[in-house]
């Protein structure tokens, strides 16, 4: 059998045109250098997520060849995606070391944004999984492809992106059966939860804040958790409001959302101390409708801060309980 990296190079060389996707979410496999450098963009946006025929044929072909067996995924989310697809890892970043399927034989590459090309190359991977939106990982990916290491980029902003990425990865591992249990079944559960939203319920507004020890920011509709609350009948009051680009208590008071949701980043204790000092401890905070009606919630970081992957339905269920009980 041909090795996976060689197969990718041969496949990319015979493709005469690049698929160009202008939709928001996408992932890609990149390999080669110089004149051989090719990037195949895999659609992860839109309502149907119908794969490009050329891309589908390429992935189908890999199923008859040797599957990637020396895979490195940087970040807990990317590592989990590959493991959920039935793959195994030879190395990952330190934040993923606690995942089921990562054992003592899995090399620890440290901080996901400070991994050297030398450390990657020394392990001789046949697939590297990275974020397309992380500048440090994008730079590492470009360097890796330059020495012939195949790179698969992920960018998951919503559930449709998760579906599309898992389609690709389960085809690469040959475990399309896992797509059924970890994507199709999850999709059905999500739809059942959405059906439980009361008909004719008054549309209420919300503000979703990401807070850390050094900064607080408002999440707009391109954040995955915003999609969850939107589909459950709420409206993001900051969706198209540039006034929220710089968060202030005055702007929150002026918009007066029905719900305020907070997700922490980094050290939770320090993040909340900073948030309390800047917002909650101010007299104007008590004037907010969300506060008066006890609709201020600190959300689970695992379900609303990190990409939930196969726990998307759990995130929906938790959000539903907050909004409608049950």
Predicted feature descriptions by range:
Residues 2-33:
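Sec-dependent N-terminal signal peptides of Gram-positive bacterial secreted proteins and lipoproteins
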Residues 26-48:
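Bacterial lipoprotein signal-peptidase II cleavage site
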Residues 68-85, 178-232:
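Basic- and aromatic-lined ligand-binding clefts that recognize polyanionic substrates
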Residues 72-123, 127-134:
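A short, structured surface patch at a secondary-structure boundary
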Residues 95-99, 217-244:
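Alpha-helical, coiled-coil/dimerization segments enriched in small aliphatic residues
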Residues 117-130, 149, 249-262:
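Proline-aspartate-enriched helix->loop->beta-strand connector
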Residues 137-139, 155-168, 207-224, 268-270:
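Extracytoplasmic ligand-binding site segments that recognize negatively charged/polar headgroups
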Residues 161-180, 184, 264-326:
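Structured C-terminal subdomain patch of bacterial secreted/periplasmic proteins
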């Amino acid at each position: 059998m041909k090795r996976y990296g060689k197969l990718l190079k041969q496949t990319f060389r015979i493709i005469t045109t690049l698929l160009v996707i202008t939709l928001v979410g996408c992932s890609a496999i990149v390999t080669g250098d110089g004149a051989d450098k090719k990037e195949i963009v895999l659609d992860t946006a839109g309502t149907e997520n119908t794969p490009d025929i050329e891309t589908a044929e390429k992935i189908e072909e890999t199923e008859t060849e040797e599957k990637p067996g020396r895979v490195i995924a940087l970040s807990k989310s990317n590592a989990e995606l590959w493991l959920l697809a039935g793959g195994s890892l030879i190395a990952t970043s330190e934040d993923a070391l606690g995942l089921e399927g990562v054992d003592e034989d899995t090399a620890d590459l440290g901080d996901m944004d400070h991994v050297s090309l030398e450390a990657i190359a020394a392990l001789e991977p046949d697939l590297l999984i990275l974020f397309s939106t992380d500048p440090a990982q994008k730079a590492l990916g470009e360097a890796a492809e330059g020495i012939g290491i195949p790179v698969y980029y992920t960018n998951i902003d919503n559930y449709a992106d998760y579906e599309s990425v898992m389609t690709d990865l389960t085809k690469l591992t040959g475990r399309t059966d896992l797509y059924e249990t970890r994507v199709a079944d999850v999709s059905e559960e999500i739809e059942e939860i959405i059906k439980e939203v009361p008909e004719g319920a008054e549309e209420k507004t919300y503000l979703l804040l990401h807070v850390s020890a050094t900064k607080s920011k408002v999440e707009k509709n391109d954040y995955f958790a915003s999609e969850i609350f939107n589909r459950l009948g709420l409206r993001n009051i900051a969706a198209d409001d540039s006034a929220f680009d710089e968060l202030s208590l005055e702007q929150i008071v002026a918009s007066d959302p029905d719900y305020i949701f907070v997700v922490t980043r980094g050290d939770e204790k320090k993040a909340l101390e900073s948030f309390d000092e800047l917002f909650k401890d101010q007299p104007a905070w008590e004037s907010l409708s969300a506060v008066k009606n006890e609709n201020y919630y600190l959300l689970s970081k695992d379900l609303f801060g990190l990409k939930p992957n196969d726990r998307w339905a759990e995130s929906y269920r938790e959000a539903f309980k907050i909004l409608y009980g049950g």
